[in-house]
Amino acid sequence: MKNYFVSIIIPCYNQAQYLVEVVDSVLGQTYANWECIIVNDGSPDHTAEVANELLKKDDRIRYVEKENGGLSSARNFGIQQATGQYILPLDADDKIAPDYVSGCIDAFKDDAGLTVVYCEAEFFGEMTGKWSLPAYTLQALLLDNMIFCTAMFKKSDWEEAGGYDEHMKNGMEDWEFWISLLKEKGRKVLKLPMVGFYYRIRGKSMVENIDPSKKMKNYEYVCKKHIDFVMEQTGNPILNYIELNLYKERLDKIKNNSLFVFCKKIKRIFDLNSTQDNRRR
């Protein structure tokens, strides 16, 4: 392996329309010691055609294909092909700032004991602005994820953690991976004070559309998988906390439902009419 060589992994499923933009953000990096692996996860669209055109732009770009297996499977497949010591996952509809890779590598050079390096982030697309995430602590990570997927880590640590869990096909696979990666004592995380990552907001972004029932199943699955660690960190109260949060989330979703709002208005009308009738009597 080349020294401080970075493998940028771009899984792609039916996102051909975004590939040029995301790869251009990789080509614009100030750090030159990288390879970019586009993983076609069985896309029925024209991902292959776009990717093959991108190969002509730079010989550091690679393209591989596989049968559809989901995001975790595609990331794992790409990382298996990677020759870099350092891995940076990057979803096909997102992009990175020109100095992001160099910032991560400088951090690893300064502190070889780091496990994960990430940065500040912003939204783009259908919504813009800063992506405000809570500060990382291991205990806070057990309650919710605050590290987006495009964070840099060592391939050797990915291997030790067992990769991304391919059973998690309904989102939140990043969260489970960070728990697997960081739960061992002594793991260090650094957040760079720079905007290096841009997360696209679109109508069907997975993060924005996880059904509460599927989210609950994800929580249950992760808690069971890492139960010893969960109990060691927080004990039983965390499970009650998770269930309470999901209950509130479901309740908010019901309250904001247009049918629920309509029924409330109808009820108010009936209540008003009933009050007026009582007064007439």
Regions found by a protein language model. Give the residues of each.
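N-proximal low-complexity "stem/linker" segments adjacent to membrane-targeting elements
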Residues: 1-27
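Cell-envelope/extracellular polymer assembly enzymes that use nucleotide-activated donors
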Residues: 4-7, 35, 176
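A conserved acidic beta->alpha catalytic loop
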Residues: 40-49, 69, 91
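Glycine-rich, basic loop-to-helix element that forms the pyrophosphate-binding segment
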Residues: 66-82
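Short aromatic/hydrophobic "clamp" motif used to bind/position activated sugar donors
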Residues: 87
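Conserved donor NDP-sugar-binding/catalytic core segment of glycosyltransferases
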Residues: 99-130
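Conserved nucleotide-sugar donor-binding catalytic segment
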Residues: 136-221
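Boundary detector for helix-to-coil junctions that initiate low-complexity/charged tails
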Residues: 220, 224-281
